[in-house]
Every structure is written in C-alpha cells, then in structure tokens.
C-alpha cells in the first residue's frame, strides 16, 4: 500500500537548526519537527532550554536531539554536522539561526565589538553554509538568517548588525550557484521586529525616544509599523522556513524572503 504524499510535509527528512534553544531558532526547530522532520537542536550554552525544545518536538511523534556547538568555531561547526549525520544517518536541511545584536554609533564602535558581531552573524553563517554543503544530501536545503535591516529598514547606530546581515544577502545569491551541482537550494529569511527576549532587550533602539516607554508600550508601538497592526512572533518566521525546507519550495533559490508584515 503506497503512502499518500502530503504537500509541505517533511516526513523522512533530517534537519539541523543552529542556535535553536530559544527565540526564533526554537520556533524553527519546533516547526520543522511539527512538519515531520527529525531535528538536531543546536545550542551554545542553554542546554536546559534546548532539551525542552527536543521534548516538544518528540511530542509530535518524530525524533530530536540536542548537540552543543559554538558556530564561531569552525571545527565545532564541522563536528556538529558530523554528529548529526552519525546520529540520524543523513542530513537534508540546515538552518543557520545563531546571531547577536549590536548597537553603537560609528564613532564609538570598537574593534572588539566589530569582531564579536561579524564572527557569529557573518563568519559563523558562512562556515555553517560551507559545512552544510559538504554534509547535505543531494536536493538539500540551506536556509540562512538575514534581517530587514540589511537592506530595507535603516536604524541609527545599527551599522554593525545591519552590515553583518547584508553580507548574508550576497552569500545567498552566490552560494545558490555554487550549490547547484548537488541540487541544494540556498535562501535566507529576513525578519523584521519579532517579539523575543532579544526584542525586549533592545526595542528602545528601534523607536525614537524609546527609553521613555515601558517594554510593553514599545511592543504595542512596534505593532503599528506593520499595516496589519500586530507584532511579529517567532512562529511567523518559522512557518516561512518550513515552506523553504519543503519540496514545494524547490524553485525558490538564491532569494531573501523578508518576513516583517509589510513594515519595511
């Protein structure tokens, strides 16, 4: 008896999501598991949070495991991919989510801060993509993380973060050519303001005079940046990643999908 094919499902696929112990990464890992994929939940420090994500994914009837790796370190990135393949037997989807945020006027940014941001947001993602190419099955998916501030939305004192994500847009365009020999598609999502712990920590920078308002007031104000007059949440990003990971997204390649509710 043949199994009925269900569009957008990921049954039989193995996915790896970096930085997926919390926030957007956790939502992505959970969504891929909900769609049927087995998931490697990567974390750098928050092991307890990562194990909670693993438990939630397993509740959907699929499998998951948490592996620690700091993707700033290329050797750890390579080992993470090796361990994923050793554990599940193959690898079909790699989502690069790890990142840090930064604010600072150009006249005040230090070399140390520049290196902190670019070592993860840019260099880290480059080598996640390289190792993904080396480890993925033919027809796999690489999905990187950009930002609407890379191109569409300018924020004062946000040059380091915006620039670190702008490089991702160029990577995606060229990687999609390099990965064609293995029929691997390469895309990125570019979230706008998304309500996470990080959002509450830095939302005052995105709203003029934001220091005068409470976190709750800033969140309400941010909702009006979109014509839909609501905030973005991690699940909004995760659903788009789920689509890009599916067979139905095969003809989407080398693209940046902005996910901001029309805010930019």
Swiss-Prot record:
Keyword Oxidoreductase carried by entry: yes
Source species taxonomy: Eukaryota, Fungi, Dikarya, Ascomycota, Pezizomycotina
UniProt entry keywords in alphabetical sequence: NADP, Oxidoreductase
Active site residues according to the UniProt entry: 146-147, 161, 165
Originating species: Cryptosporiopsis sp. (strain 8999)
Protein task: Short chain dehydrogenase/reductase; part of the gene cluster that mediates the biosynthesis of the dimeric xanthones cryptosporioptides. The pathway begins with the synthesis of atrochrysone thioester by the polyketide synthase dmx-nrPKS. The atrochrysone carboxyl ACP thioesterase dmxR1 then breaks the thioester bond and releases the atrochrysone carboxylic acid from dmx-nrPKS. Atrochrysone carboxylic acid is decarboxylated by the decarboxylase dmxR15, and oxidized by the anthrone oxygenase dmxR16 to yield emodin. Emodin is then reduced to emodin hydroquinone by the oxidoreductase dmxR7.
Reaction equation(s) it catalyzes: 3,8,9,10-tetrahydroxy-6-methyl-1,4-dihydroanthracen-1-one + NADPH + H(+) = (3R)-3,8,9,10-tetrahydroxy-6-methyl-1,2,3,4-tetrahydroanthracen-1-one + NADP(+)
Catalytic activity, EC: 1.3.1.-
Primary gene name: dmxR18
Functional pathway: Secondary metabolite biosynthesis
Homology family: Belongs to the short-chain dehydrogenases/reductases (SDR) family.
Protein name as it appears in the record: Short chain dehydrogenase/reductase dmxR18
Gene Ontology MF annotations: oxidoreductase activity, acting on CH-OH group of donors
Positions that bind NADP(+): 24, 70, 97, 130, 161, 165, 196
Stored Pfam families: adh_short_C2
